[in-house]
Each structure stands twice: as C-alpha cells, then as structure tokens.
Amino acid sequence: MINIKENEDLSRLNHSCAHLLAQAVKHLYPNAKFWVGPVIEDGFYYDIDLGDEVIKEEDLPKIEKEMKKIAKDGKRIVRHELTKKEALEMFHDDPYKIDLISRMDEKEQVISCYTQGDFTDLCRGPHVDTVKELKYFKLIKVSGAYWKADSNNKMLQRIYGVCFRNEEDLNDYIKELEDRKARDHRKIGKDLDIFMNHDLVGKGMPLWLPNGSIVRKELENYIYHKEQKLGYSHVYTPCVGTVDLYKTSGHWDHYKENMFPSMKVDDEEFVLRPMNCPHHMLIYGNTIHSYRELPIKIGEFATDFRYEASGAVKGLERVRCMCRNDAHLFVRPDQIKQEFKEVVSLILDVYKDFGLKNYTFRLSLRDPEDKHKYFDDDEMWNNAENELREVLNEIGVPYHEAIGEAAFYGPKLDVEVKPAVGPEVTLSTCQLDFLLPRRFNLSYIDNNGEKKVPVVLHRAIFGTFDRFTAFILEETKGALPLWLSPVQINIIPVNNEYHLEYATNLLNKLRDKEFRVELDSRDEKMGYKIREAQTKKIPYTLVLGNNERDNNTITYRKYGEESTTTMSTEEFITMIEEQIKEYK
C-alpha cells in the first residue's frame, strides 16, 4: 500500500477528510467532542468523546452519507490565526482543545484553526481549498483508544478512514484492505483454531491450541533436524535466572526496561529471562575446551519473556511470552567467516523451503569515526566486518550496510522480509559478540596451551516460532503446505450405512502412516461437509462412495480446486509421502 502520510497531496486530502468526518459526527451527535485527527500511513483517524453514546461499525454508512452531503455543498476551508488567549476563549467549553492549547509553547505566537461551514477545529494544516474535493473516501472501522494513549484516562472512540483523488485508487485500496483482512493471522488463527488469548492469562500471552501446537511442533522438528545435521547440540534451560546472572551479562543494566519485574524467593532474587545467552554461556563454561573442539554450537527452543506495552502486543506477531529458535556458536576468531557463512546458507535454505523470495540482508557495522561507542579491539572489528562482507558477496545475496548501527559488542546481520501485506519484518538475525564471553570469563586452550577468549555468534533462523507462524499464516492465508497442516486429510463417507466401515478402515490405514487425518461422519449434507473442509483449508478431502469401496480406491479434491481425482489407496499414500518428504 502507498504510504499516505509521506505523499504530500494524499496527506493533505486525508487531513481534510478527517475534519469532514468530525463535522459529520458533530451533525449527527451534537454532544461530541474531539481530541486529535491525524494522517497515518493508511489514511486518517479521529478520536472522539461521545459520552454515553457508542458508534458501531453499522453506523459508519450513516456518517459517510452525512460526509457526502457536506462535501456536496462545497464550502471553502478557511484558515484563521489566533493568539493563545483568543484560542482559549474560542474553545473554552472543549476540555480536549483546552488541553492542547495549554500545552503549546508560550513562544508560539500564532495558533491556527480551520473552518468549513459550521465546523471549526484547531489545526496546523495544511488542507485542501474546499470540501468539494473530498469525493472518494471510505470509513474503515471504529475502535477504542485511551485519551493520550494512557490506560488511566478515558476511553475515546476512534474512527478510521481513507480518502483518494479518484474512485479507481479508492477501490484498489479497498481491495487491498480486504486482502489484508483476509491475511490477518489473528483472524486465521481464530478460524483455524491455531491460538487464542484470554484476559485471565494476560495480554501478549497466547495459548497455542491443538492445531497450533501441531504447526509449532512441525516447525520445531523441521529446524531441529537441519541444525542437527550441522552439528548443533540442543539443551533445555530454565525460563528464569537470578538477577545476578543478568548483572553479569549486562542485561540488568542495559535491558532492564524490557524485562519483567524481579521476584524474591527465599534469599534469592529471580527474573523471567528475556533471552537465553547467559544460560548458554554457563553451559559452555561448565567444562574446559580445546581449540580443536570449536566451533561449539548450542541450540534451544527456549521460552523467553519480554515486557511489551499492552497496546503494542498483537496476536502471535508481538507477544510478551515467546519461544525462540535460538542458538549460540562459540568460535575461534579464524572460524568467524566459515560459521557466519554456514548461518547465512541455513537461512537461505529455510527461506527456499518456505518459498520466501522478497527479502534483503541488513549488515550493521560500527562507525569508524566514532570508535569510543564500540568494544575496543580494532583488529577484531576490522577482520570480522571484512569477513562478513566477503561472505555476503561470495553467496551473492542482496544486502545493504548500516554504518553506525552495530551493537557495542559486535556487527550484526538482520534479514528483512517483505510480507504479502504490511511493512518489512525482521525474521532472522545473526549477531557477533566479542564482549559477552569475557563477561563470563569463557575461554578455550589454543595450540600453544594458552587461554583464549572465543567469539560468540548469536543466531535465530525463525526468530521466534510465534512471529514466524504469524508470518506464514499471512503469507499462505492459512492454506499451509501439506507437511505443516494440522489436518492433512479429511475423509467423508457418502452414506454412513454403506460407506462408514470402508472410511474407518482407510482412516486407520492412513494414521498408521502417521498422516494427520479426520473422519467426518456427521449427519450433515455432503455439500456442507465439503465446503466446511474448504473453509478449514484442509489440503485433501476424500469422498468415499460405492465406487471407492468396491474398487479399493479413493477420490480426492485438493484445497482450492473444483476437480476431483480417483486413484488406488496405495497410489494416494505414495503421493502424500513424497509430498511430505520434500520438506524432511
């Protein structure tokens, strides 16, 4: 979608349409008072206090009708400039405008407002010349929003809308908006029983339902086998640690605002972990290592907790409790290039399997003109940065350098993926760390018998299973590939009296092959059952009648297709096995 906020003409148009919305609301709800109505990437919104009245989605057409009536009158939009005193007098009975005016800088000599017909609002502008220009608009939705985004304040009603110069652009936007809604992983997650949330558990704490658990377990198995082939050793560690652990790692001093509050138990103070690296440092440090043992690769599917503002959490995409596909590689300096290349190759391998093509690599490097901001080892930095560049150039992946955006302790690689809708998201990361091994006094014995400090590569291929699941649900609109689908095959007997026995025998045979199969023997019409299987986006629906029973065959219909295919049971089993093996 076009970024309306960054388009000067569309920004002005949508800003004016926000005022048109407010004017229409004022006509229909005379007691309405208004907070702010800014332009955003997707259009505009206005926050409104209606007292005890509530605007619902079904009220939006009525408001649109009033907006069109006002626009047809063609009143000019006129700017007025006031002193602060004059502005306070003009809006004396509006507590929201009084609040805005009162907080304006005393040095601001001129306060502007705009008038269109019988409506005047405080605003910096700019606006279009007349309301007649506001022809092609649509109110999208209504939601709640706390005044000043503070949950201690009153809840206002927020109406979203969008405006374009012509009908074609508006219709294109609405189509894309419908596609975005259809791809929203929160809707898909609910429709397909992937996950849920509950206030008693808490915001940002998703509950994975049986179908979602299957998806997550398949993702875990998939990446586990890939990591195992590359020599990773997986561990389990507690999801809490002492405050002293995070003081040692530095997280307590530099990351505390993103952590949950600590809790005292007996004479110890614990905290939910925000990340797993401190635990993995201790595992590495548990034994003495020779240079010959390196690299040592420690992986974990670890539950972490990070504080997110309640207004920021979103389905599985942004959560407070997450499971990371985490690993830490302990390497010698001369192994950095080799291991970094292996990580990048693994990322590309995974993306190929999932059909991801629209992505770019972001290499965050230090600013050589501002060296005091970074860990003090010029040779280590120069060698590492050059080797990372060499790897990306050798593999031939698209990347850009972000100078000055490296962490204090080392350069970092982020993979930014463009989803089907919405802005780019970061899925995979690989961070070099020169400092953390020193904080934990980690070492290995080199070929001269001397202690040396290893370098650590923090890497996450999926990022978190939560965000990756959200991403894949939106990419596929919930039509997951066969190997990842919670239910792979749905069996429907035409008539239970004559075909249920054959269907049940087939069910057992397919389950013996470890396929995920359901049998729909409900007393419902055949067409209804088939449509429901399509709604659930089950890859294969088998319909079994006389012909199938008598000839030991099956007739299947693939999700999204109208045609059917008949084949022997053994042929079908072989076909399914081959499709699943492509990802194993």
PLM feature spans:
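NTP/phosphate- and nucleic-acid-binding module
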Residues: 1-35, 39-41, 47-584
